[in-house]
Amino acid sequence: MAMGPREGGGGGSAFGFSTRQVVVAGIIGGIALFLGATRLGFIPVPIPLIGNATIMHIPAVVGGALEGPVVGLLAGLIFGVFSFLYAESPIFANPLIAILPRLLIGVVAWAVFIGLRRFSVDLASVAAGVFGSLTNSVGVVGLAVLFGFLPLAVVPTLIPQVIAEAVLAAVVTIVVVRGVLLVRSGRTTAPEVSSDEERRY
């Protein structure tokens, strides 16, 4: 597929940034930095077997769904770096566990979103939120078990936290995506992705 210059810009192209993508990447990155630096993105839980609960994955999910895998990857990188630098569990002192799954959050969210948006933008948004969040949770837990930080027997006790994070990501993603599409279209009801918007992916 030819990757020539694009006008206006938009999410979804795996390579090359439009002006809009640069702006959105800056905003998403700023939000991720704020959540990480203030620790507002990390929510203490009574039994932190795999560290705190988090909303840090949400900027990566939204960035990936709206503006493509590179924006999502950058937001995920910020999430991973903060997890590593401020590790409150030995699990996240391992950079592979702290960073690698987070790099994939936005990429998976993007892939799911572009795969489902032809059926429904709302469905695509919810699925991107869920699968992006599960990429983080399953990746972290899987690597923690693999490296011996977490006994396999305790994994079922983590399911409520995993579900809560996935539901939150789904809700926020659909709200943000609908809002952004409304702003872009100038309508009062959220449109489906237009043919012009399709080309941006």
Regions found by a protein language model. Give the residues of each.
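Hydrophobic transmembrane alpha-helices
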Residues: 2-65
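Internal alpha-helical transmembrane segments of multi-pass membrane proteins
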Residues: 22, 114-137, 188-201
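Mid-bilayer segments of alpha-helical transmembrane spans in multi-pass integral membrane proteins
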Residues: 103, 107, 111, 130-145
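Interfacial aromatic-anchored transmembrane helix boundaries in multi-pass membrane proteins
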Residues: 35-51, 77-112, 153-156
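Alpha-helical transmembrane segments and their cytosolic interface
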Residues: 1-29, 150-201
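Membrane-interfacial segments
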Residues: 39-44, 86, 90, 112, ...
